[in-house]
């Protein structure tokens, strides 16, 4: 047999239900142990808890998140209908009008193609346009994905998705113990500047190594 037999499993559940929050948190913290970096993962017990997220993000962020394999992901057809994301850096550089014109050109081309070539029209849609998709994965994969994708080296688009996932696990799902395990989630608020600094640090290391 595998796992706990029914009486033992029921006994464990009864004991957990009788525990206070602090006692439960103590058990969780003991299970996680000390993590010196995000590659130190807790065991497979986290695979018993699943999360499902309904996400709208720009297509560029979707493509990066789609690369994670230990999950189920389903997406709608890529179109311009959900609008697009214009980075703050575009506004600050005074290029907002040119950016919007480029997005309009992309949408017009999609419209022209969609009637005759509906399956190919998506290739005309800029990566800045939003797409809606559903991601489902267990808590162990959540820790890997969220800690990786919120790091300062990440792109702001998928960083914000990961940060919101972490918040929802803690607040909406009420799984604060699991959210607390994710000690390497970065919620800092200036991702562009931090990403630039991280790139400079990496470049300096490469130069030193070379």
Where are these regions (language model features)?
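A conserved ligand/cofactor-binding region detector
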Residues: 1-210
């Amino acid at each position: 047999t595998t796992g706990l037999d029914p009486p033992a499993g029921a006994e464990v559940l009864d004991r957990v239900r009788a525990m206070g929050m602090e006692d439960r948190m103590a058990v969780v913290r003991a299970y996680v142990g000390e993590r010196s970096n995000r590659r130190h993962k807790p065991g497979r017990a986290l695979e018993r808890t699943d999360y499902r997220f309904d996400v709208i993000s720009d297509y560029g962020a979707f493509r990066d998140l789609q690369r994670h394999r230990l999950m189920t992901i389903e997406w709608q057809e890529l179109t311009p209908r959900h609008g697009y994301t214009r980075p703050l850096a575009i506004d600050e550089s005074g290029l907002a009008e040119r950016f919007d014109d480029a997005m309009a050109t992309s949408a017009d081309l999609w419209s022209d193609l969609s009637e005759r070539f509906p399956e190919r029209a998506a290739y005309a849609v800029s990566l800045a346009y939003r797409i809606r998709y559903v991601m489902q994965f267990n808590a162990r994969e959540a820790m890997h994905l969220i800690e990786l994708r919120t790091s300062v080296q990440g792109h702001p688009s998928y960083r914000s998705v990961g940060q919101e996932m972490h918040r929802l696990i803690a607040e909406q799902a009420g799984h604060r113990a699991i959210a607390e395990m994710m000690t390497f989630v970065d919620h800092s608020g200036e991702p562009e500047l931090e990403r630039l600094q991280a790139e400079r640090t990496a470049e300096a290391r490469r130069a030193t190594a070379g």
